[in-house]
Structure formats: C-alpha cells, structure tokens
A protein has these predicted regions:
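Short, hydrophobic alpha-helical segments
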Residues: 26, 104, 181-191
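Conserved beta-strand scaffold positions in the cores of enzyme catalytic domains, especially
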Residues: 146-148
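Serine-dependent acyl-ester chemistry module
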Residues: 1-137, 142, 152-163
C-alpha cells in the first residue's frame, strides 16, 4: 500500500472516529468542544510523498538552497515560488518557499505554504492541517463547539517563540488556552 493511500485511509478513519465521538456525546446530552492541534510550522516536513517532485527541477532546487545559504532571499523567492507551483504537492518545495517568504516579511504567503508543507508531509508523524480541517468540518456538521488553538498560536508566532520543541507549545500558551476554554465552558453551561 502506498504512503499516500495509507494517509488517505488514516484521514478517513479519523473523520469517522470524530463523527462517532461527537454523535456519542450529543446522544448523551453532553457538550463537545473540539480543539485543533497546534502545529509547529517552523519544523520541516520529514518526507515528501513519492512522485511529488519533478526531478527535472532538481537543479533549480539546488540553486535555491545555495541562494538561501548566501542569504539572497529575494532571488531565491521567485525560483522557490515557481518550484512550489509546479511541484504543488511536494512538502519540501512548499516548506522552502514558505521559509523564504517569511524571511521577506510575506507572512500570509509564508503561512499558506508552511501549512501546505505540513499537510503534504508524507510521514504523518505529527498533527496536520488535514486533521484540523477534518475536526473543524465534523464539529461544524454537528453544530459542536470548535476552538482553533493552532490559529491562536500562529497569530502569536510573529511575536516570538511559541513552541518549546518540534511539537509542544510553551506553557504560557497552554495556560492562555486553558483559561479561554474555561470561559467558553462557563458560557456553554451558563455559569
């Protein structure tokens, strides 16, 4: 079974499990609060899926990497943008372009490509924008509450270091999240 097929099955299974969990909670008159998983977008993807990179562009990719080493982000930007467009399901191409866009202060473009890099990471070793999207879609379908922790952390990412390692946010952000969730629960329960 191919890596892509395995990931597709994993995502479908996750969607089914979340759907069943929310239905179970609602059937028992319980509140369900879905919380998106934080994703450290500064961590490179572990692997791109087979067949996602056109090898005829290898020279251009090597050129971009050399330009990054020389800190020539402006020249690297146009080449990396082309690579990300042509190899549009390649995690590494999106990651490199996202990092270059971030260096040039193009924050929205950087966020878009770094999220795509995480989504196209074939290793499935951490949370992914795909899981968060499934969670939000399923919560919306059942009219369940949804708290976007990932978006909250990304909003704070420009202000400093948010993550203490590849996966976990700093405790400060977890405390803020806990307080926000507690307030939401109080409103839901009308306390």
């Amino acid at each position: 079974i191919s890596t892509q097929k395995r990931n597709e099955i994993t995502f479908k299974l996750f969607e089914s499990e979340v759907d069943e969990l929310i239905t179970y909670a609602k059937d028992r008159n319980s509140y369900f609060l879905a919380i998106s998983a934080p994703i450290n977008l500064d961590v490179p993807p572990k692997s791109s899926c087979p067949g996602s990179f056109d090898e005829s562009f290898r020279t251009k990719l090597d050129n971009v990497i050399e330009l990054i080493k020389k800190k020539d982000y402006k020249l690297a930007y146009s080449i990396s943008k082309e690579l990300a467009l042509i190899n549009n399901s390649n995690a590494r191409s999106h990651f490199i372009h996202g990092k270059i866009a971030k260096k040039l202060g193009k924050d929205q473009e950087a966020l878009k490509h770094l999220e795509l890099a995480a989504a196209f990471d074939c290793d499935n070793w951490r949370s992914s924008p795909v899981y968060n999207s499934i969670l939000k879609k399923t919560a919306d379908k059942h009219d369940a509450a949804f708290f976007d922790l990932h978006a909250l952390l990304q909003d704070n990412a420009s202000k400093g270091v948010v993550f203490m390692d590849d996966i976990y946010p700093q405790n400060l952000y977890l405390e803020k999240t806990a307080n926000t969730i507690a307030d939401r629960i109080k409103k839901l329960l009308k306390l």
